Regions:
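Short helix-initiation/N-cap motifs at beta->coil->alpha
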Residues: 71-80, 99, 168-174, 244-258
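Periplasmic solute-binding protein
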Residues: 102-109, 127-164, 191-214, 300, ...
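Conserved N-terminal structural module of periplasmic/extracytoplasmic solute-binding proteins
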Residues: 2, 7-15, 22-103, 109, ...
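Extracytoplasmic/periplasmic substrate-recognition and gating elements
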Residues: 60-61, 66, 159, 230, ...
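Glycine-centered hinge/linker elements that transmit conformational signals in sensory
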Residues: 177-179, 217-245
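Alpha-to-beta junction loops
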Residues: 85-96, 185-186, 258-266
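Hinge/lid segment of periplasmic solute-binding proteins
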Residues: 97-148, 174, 182, 201, ...
Length: 427
């Protein structure tokens, strides 16, 4: 569930088409036929096996139904979904990311799932990410996630630095990075340009916000927010942090697993893939909660961005009745448990976190994901509002301009404030 490219989605095409009357799109093309043969479209091939376990469990109880899981890459997924929405040929079942929920829900594309989702079984964040602007639920919460601190135990041992734990603050992060660099020549904390897996977490730990609670006002220039952004950007000025140019050539993930750096932030959704991809590193790295802000403007200094994905179906699909029944199944404890036991994502259903945690030991992976689960207690909803597709690419470019020295940090923060304010006004 890579998030980096998620923020580059083109939404204007679908928005324009929908406003011309293609609301409540059905499924009349090659994707489905209305004969009990359904297509389930996802964007992550790594989760295909887990989704097939779900469909197999459902089909066992419904032998007349056939559901085919189709996986594509992220960019292709949204290109195809947008095209199918404007040509009345949507897949019967598909994933919906919070980035795009408002666009599809508010234009009548998605079926209302309010009657099949028991909101008490899911976190407020998971439900909010499945809602349209009208407050109705347009998808079944699939999973939930966290941003985690990944660290290399061997490098820490070489430097004589204690492993990160829940007492760590930003000061510990920088002090450990400095000592690691001095003792080993390896990078410490690798602070790459990113919002969800980067500076947003520091903003909310410092008591700041990117948007106000209802998403109607930008908060970049508020002291708690701007100070945290400056802190994060300035981390790159240390010798122990790679430059953004270096990250553009070699990702933090690649640098970490090749032994060049000791720490970076990653998504919980990446951990299973890390384990299966970098098998030679098994037992040499682990995960911890995010360091807290030592002197926040408000709050206790703890926060972590949490997001979620939803299962959805078209409002007027030919197989809508079957699709809705399947969504009811994946909303159940049984359906959510099956997904958790696949190991790729933390189930959205409250109380099933251990089904995901346990898969790591079951597969022989020597890390401790149970360390990160307590962060859900102070998690913060992924930053989003209906105008996000308009402002996000411009904000991202501004961040890159700051790093490149094309604009000062102060001017860049003001620019981000103006960009988001204008986008909200035009929505």
């Amino acid at each position: 569930m890579e998030r980096k490219n998620m923020r580059r989605i083109a939404s204007l095409v679908i928005a324009g088409a929908l406003t011309l009357g293609l609301t409540a799109c059905g499924t009349s093309g090659n994707e489905s036929s209305g004969d009990g043969k359904l297509v389930f479209q996802i964007w992550d091939a790594g989760q295909k096996a887990g989704m097939e376990k779900l469909t197999e469990a459902y089909m066992e109880e419904h032998p007349d139904v056939k559901i085919e899981v189709q996986a594509t890459g992220w960019d292709e997924y949204w290109t195809k979904l947008e095209a199918s929405a404007t040509s009345n040929s949507m897949p019967d079942i598909f994933w919906m990311h919070s980035n795009q929920m408002y666009k599809y829900a508010d234009n009548g594309i998605l079926a209302d799932c309010s009657d099949i989702v028991d909101a008490s079984c899911f976190s407020n964040i998971s439900i909010a990410n499945a809602e349209g602007s009208d407050g109705n639920i347009y998808g079944v919460p699939k999973d939930k996630d966290l941003v985690v601190l990944v660290y290399n135990k061997e490098i820490f041992n070489q430097a004589g630095v204690a492993y990160p734990d829940d007492t760590w603050t930003w000061d510990n992060l920088t002090e450990a990075s400095e000592k690691i660099y001095e003792q080993t020549g390896k990078y410490g904390y690798m602070a790459y340009a990113h919002d969800q897996v980067g500076y947003w977490n520091f903003v909310y730990q410092n008591g700041g916000e990117i948007l106000n609670e209802d998403g109607t006002k930008a908060e970049y220039t508020e002291k708690a927010t701007s100070d945290a952004i400056k802190f994060y950007v300035n981390l790159q000025n240390n010798d122990w942090c790679p430059t953004q140019e270096q990250f553009a050539n070699t990702s933090a993930t690649e640098q970490f697993f090749s032994g060049q750096g000791a720490m970076f932030f990653a998504g919980s959704w990446d951990l299973a893939n890390f384990c299966s991809t970098y098998t030679d590193m098994n037992g040499k790295w682990d995960v911890a909660v995010l360091p807290k802000c030592p002197n926040p403007e408000s709050g206790d200094g703890r926060a972590v961005i949490s997001n979620s994905v939803s299962y959805a179906t078209a409002a007027e699909g030919k197989n809508k009745d079957i699709a809705m029944d399947f969504l009811k199944f994946v909303a159940s404890e049984e359906g959510q448990r099956i997904q958790g036991e696949s190991g790729v994502a933390i189930p959205a259903y409250n109380g099933l976190e251990d089904t995901w945690v346990n898969t790591f030991a079951e597969n022989g992976y020597d890390i401790h994901p149970e360390n990160i689960i307590p962060m859900f207690e102070y998690s913060v909803k992924y930053v989003n509002n209906p105008s996000r597709p308009s402002w996000e690419p411009k904000v991202e470019q501004t961040v890159l301009d700051i790093y490149a020295g094309n604009t000062s940090v102060d001017d860049g923060i003001q620019n981000m404030q103006d960009i988001v304010t204008e986008a909200i006004a035009e929505e």
